């Protein structure tokens, strides 16, 4: 027979013990006193009410309290608590850039700074300087830029690059490259060379290659991209770039597309305790490879969505559907038109851009990834690519609901009301980078006309339809946070979302502006949701990771054009002050 439990009034001794144990457990986890308190500030929590508090307390890398100065200091302050008077400054949740390319950015200026390359003359000067220091016969690579950002507003051809007779030259425009005459010669590319599948060798009016290769870089001989950097240099460059992101106010970033080698670099940085901030990796595969190879690799990969921890984990699986709008390979719903042919060096009046695989192949690859538990994503810049991605998602949705995977379109630069409605029905999010609008809007307006850009990065239309937006930069080249390709300063991105101002000072479709609060959510709680992390980051609430950024002016009330000038004065990551400029 079990012994009866002694009672004191209505409370059992066992119950009292359980309560005591629970209290002790909380004390062990949180401790009696906070490690850090920020007070006398404007703490923008980005909670469900978008409340603004005066103070926040941190213990063991977690937020433990928010509220008034008096309440937080009285309940959380102890003899060992560091107390910081914000003197009225604003604190935001740690900012999240959902899509950038840290390794590429880190390597771009690892050995020497890059000059501005905004004209043919600047490109030619760069080639001449490199020719003086590069052994004859070795490739000279002109760092990435786009014809939409050149004063000439025209893709260079081989003649523009023919300023050195002794070196093959490559002009890097991402999915399109241009090579000089010597580069064509040593690669054996002639008027009779067939274009590769899903690629094209562009030709002049005489039928000779003009140097422009669209998704045809595989034809080049002797080019060794990245081979000049050792693994240690790559690790150092990656670490350096991630640290620059942290200093800009970012506490989490989304790697925009890493292959197997690049994934190992992240894992090594983490193992060596050199990871400066939180990283969510998008695993990218080259959809141009044979289908059997792709599905075999997907099924045997040792990771899937959400594997990892708060510092390094896997996000989505990614393939590229099309190329870029800045180089004329984004797959559009309509042909590019006369100015597009001039800008991009096109000759076919019916050219709509490029798809990198067949619809059947995309479906098969995504089906294999979904079976492994991946969230699905795709680089889609043109409207035609957006539509094909949604058709693929609808086919998968008929097999099993796709919404729980939190799949998303990356860029989705050219939208339509119909496509946005389909995204809402499927639960597809939009991974957007406002920098493209700012940097390339004026050139693209010449290609498509003002009305043709009505749904170009349509943030307001997304929100009105109930589509989740995650904000980012698509940074890829350069160290300067405000002048890089693309600028990774998060406040630059927020400013564009709020104003829709281009680099010419024009406003592109003001009806698509969002509020400051909405813009901030794209870099905080909505970006966290896209990463399956809204329960641990993206807002300043008790129990969440203590990631915050203190800024030098009031984001919510400063003049609009001051948003882009905001500077972080303190960054807190995992409860520790890691950047301090106050």
Feature locations, PLM:
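Divalent metal-binding segments
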Residues: 33-39, 48-299, 306, 311-315, ...
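Short, charged, surface-exposed secondary-structure boundary motifs
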Residues: 289-292, 440-444, 581-582
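His/Asp/Glu-enriched, well-ordered alpha-helical/loop segment
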Residues: 367-377, 384-407, 411, 417-421, ...
């Amino acid at each position: 027979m079990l012994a009866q439990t002694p009672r004191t009034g209505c409370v059992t001794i066992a119950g009292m013990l359980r309560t005591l144990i629970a209290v002790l457990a909380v004390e062990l986890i949180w401790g009696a006193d906070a490690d850090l308190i920020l007070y006398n500030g404007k703490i923008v929590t980005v909670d469900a009410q978008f409340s603004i508090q005066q103070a926040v307390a941190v213990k063991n890398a977690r937020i433990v309290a928010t509220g008034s100065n008096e309440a937080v200091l009285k309940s959380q302050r102890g003899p060992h608590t560091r107390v910081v008077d914000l003197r009225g400054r604003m604190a935001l949740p740690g900012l999240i850039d959902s899509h950038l390319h840290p390794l590429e950015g880190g390597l771009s200026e690892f050995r020497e700074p890059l000059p501005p390359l905004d004209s043919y003359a600047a490109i030619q000067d760069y080639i001449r300087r490199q020719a003086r220091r590069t052994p004859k016969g070795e490739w000279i690579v002109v760092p990435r830029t786009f014809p939409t950002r050149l004063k000439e507003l025209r893709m260079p051809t081989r003649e523009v690059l023919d300023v050195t007779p002794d070196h093959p030259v490559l002009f890097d425009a991402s999915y399109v490259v241009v090579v000089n005459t010597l580069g064509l010669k040593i690669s054996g590319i002639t008027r009779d060379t067939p274009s590769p599948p899903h690629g094209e060798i562009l030709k002049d009016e005489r039928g000779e290659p003009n140097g422009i290769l669209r998704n045809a870089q595989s034809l080049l001989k002797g080019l060794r991209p990245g081979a000049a950097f050792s693994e240690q240099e790559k690790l150092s460059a990656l670490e350096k770039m991630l640290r620059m992101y942290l200093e800009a106010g970012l506490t989490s970033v989304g790697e925009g597309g890493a292959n197997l080698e690049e994934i190992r670099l992240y894992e090594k940085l983490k193992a060596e305790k050199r990871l400066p901030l939180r990283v969510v990796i998008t695993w990218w595969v080259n959809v141009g490879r044979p289908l059997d190879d792709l599905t075999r690799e997907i099924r045997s990969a040792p990771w899937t969505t959400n594997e990892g921890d708060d510092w390094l984990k896997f996000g989505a699986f990614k393939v590229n559907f099309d190329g870029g709008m800045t180089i004329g390979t984004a797959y559009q719903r309509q042909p590019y038109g006369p100015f597009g042919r001039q800008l991009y060096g096109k000759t076919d009046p019916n050219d709509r851009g490029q798809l990198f695989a067949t619809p059947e192949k995309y479906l098969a690859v995504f089906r294999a990834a979904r079976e492994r538990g991946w969230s699905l994503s795709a680089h889609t810049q043109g409207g035609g690519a957006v539509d094909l991605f949604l058709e693929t998602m609808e086919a998968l949705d008929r097999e099993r609901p796709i919404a729980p995977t939190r799949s998303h379109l990356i860029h989705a630069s050219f939208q339509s009301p119909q496509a946005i409605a389909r995204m809402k029905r499927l639960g597809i999010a939009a991974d957007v980078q406002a920098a493209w609008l700012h940097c390339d809007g004026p050139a693209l307006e010449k290609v498509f006309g003002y009305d043709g850009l009505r749904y170009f990065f349509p943030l307001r239309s997304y929100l009105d339809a109930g589509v989740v937006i995650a904000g980012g930069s698509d940074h890829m080249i350069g160290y300067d946070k405000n002048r890089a390709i693309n600028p990774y300063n998060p406040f630059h991105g927020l400013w564009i979302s709020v104003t829709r101002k281009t680099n010419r000072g024009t406003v592109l479709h003001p009806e698509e502006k969002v509020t400051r609060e909405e813009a901030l959510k794209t870099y905080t709680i909505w970006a966290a949701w896209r990463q399956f992390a809204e329960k641990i980051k993206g807002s300043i609430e008790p129990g969440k990771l203590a990631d915050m950024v203190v800024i030098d002016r009031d984001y919510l009330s400063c003049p609009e054009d001051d948003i882009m000038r905001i500077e972080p004065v303190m960054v807190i990551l995992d409860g520790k002050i890691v950047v301090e400029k106050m």
